[in-house]
Amino acid sequence: MASFITRAERSGNIFSRVTGLIRAGQLNWADRPLWYDVYVSSPPLTPPDWNVKLAKYDEPIRSIFYEEDVLRAKFYKTYRSTAGIQVDSSRTSVSQQFINEYKLVKSENAEATDDQLFEMTQKRLNENGIVLK
């Protein structure tokens, strides 16, 4: 019955599909699902509409990038980490130390550009003994 219809091209709700299978003889009346009799005896007040377009259907999906995510991506692009990140470790990772230091530098130098802040953070971490490779 529905071999030519994919799930993306739905042929109707599940009730109409099961009803079609029963009428076509593909599903025995005795083998019908438990919910079928309940649905027949008390159908929904409004018919189910499976082809509803939501309010924001045509709007593109917004990119959500937090400042920390962009900074972490730039850090890993500049310094490719060869060491594994241990999730259960109590020590903060080098990238997290970089981000924390970046926030401190940014609070001290509010007028600096992102590239200048990145370079100042590199210098400050090198002065503190954290080697960035």
UniProtKB/Swiss-Prot annotation:
User: Subunit details for this protein?
Assistant: Component of the mitochondrial ribosome small subunit (28S) which comprises a 12S rRNA and about 30 distinct proteins.
Q: Name one GO biological process term.
A: translation
**Which keywords has UniProt assigned to this entry?**
Mitochondrion, Ribonucleoprotein, Ribosomal protein
Q: Which GO terms describe its molecular function?
A: structural constituent of ribosome
Organism of origin: Caenorhabditis elegans
Entry's localization field: Mitochondrion
Stated name of the protein = Small ribosomal subunit protein mS23
Keyword Mitochondrion part of the UniProt annotation: yes
- Signal peptide residues are none
**Where does this protein chiefly localize?**
mitochondrion
Report one GO cellular component: mitochondrial small ribosomal subunit
The UniProt entry's sequence similarity note says: Belongs to the mitochondrion-specific ribosomal protein mS23 family.
